[in-house]
Design a protein with these regions (language model features):
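Surface-exposed, charge/polar-rich loops and edge strands
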Residues: 2, 10-188
Length: 188
């Protein structure tokens, strides 16, 4: 197949996962995030839920510009710096095909989750690994994500983010797998 444009110029659909925010708090609205995405060249931006999940289309070469625009919008609105984790929709589809939760010997499960790692960070320790409270179990990992299940212990669910951050020494963001399924069901 002959390409008429460089791979870097080809449009792709991406998802942005913003760490540690709730849309509607601290002046951070959906419109602020969608407008920041559009101003940076992200076309057809769409917001999912209230936890900072945005999809958009842009050339691969422009992805970092959109990331910076979203990080700036969060900083201006909330006064905090929070990282944005970008993944292509194709990468998310590959993660879904991996079927990390498929054999599910992890019952009873409260949530199935995915934790996104910053670029250049990789989970290399053996899995599965459980938290000291046994409310989180890390079950699978790729070069840019860790899959986990959470359980209710003492009436409270665990969350994988703090465990992964402690082990790797980096900031991460975690999403319920249902959020990823929702994005993949309708990424436009």
């Amino acid at each position: 197949m002959v390409r008429h444009r460089d791979e870097e110029e080809e449009d792709a659909r991406h998802a942005a996962f913003i760490r540690n925010i709730m849309v509607g708090r601290e002046g951070l609205t959906r419109s602020v995030l969608l407008e920041a995405t559009a101003r940076a060249g992200g076309r057809l931006p769409r917001s999912y839920l209230s936890t900072g999940n945005i999809t958009f289309t842009t050339p691969v070469a422009n992805v970092d510009r959109v990331r910076r625009a979203l990080e700036d919008a969060v900083r201006v609105s909330s006064g905090r710096r929070e990282p944005v984790f970008l993944r292509s929709i194709n990468e998310l589809r590959g993660l879904a095909q991996r079927d990390s939760f498929g054999s599910d010997p992890y019952s009873p499960v409260h949530e199935r989750c995915i934790t996104f790692l910053p670029d250049g960070t990789e989970w290399i320790d053996p899995l599965p690994e459980s938290s000291t409270r046994n409310d989180v179990e890390l079950i699978d990992a790729t070069d840019r994500a860790v899959f986990s299940v959470t359980r209710l212990v003492g009436g409270r669910p665990g969350t994988a983010g703090p465990l992964v951050e402690q082990r790797l020494g980096v900031e991460v963001t975690t999403r319920n797998w249902n959020t990823i399924a929702r994005i993949l069901a309708n990424p436009l």
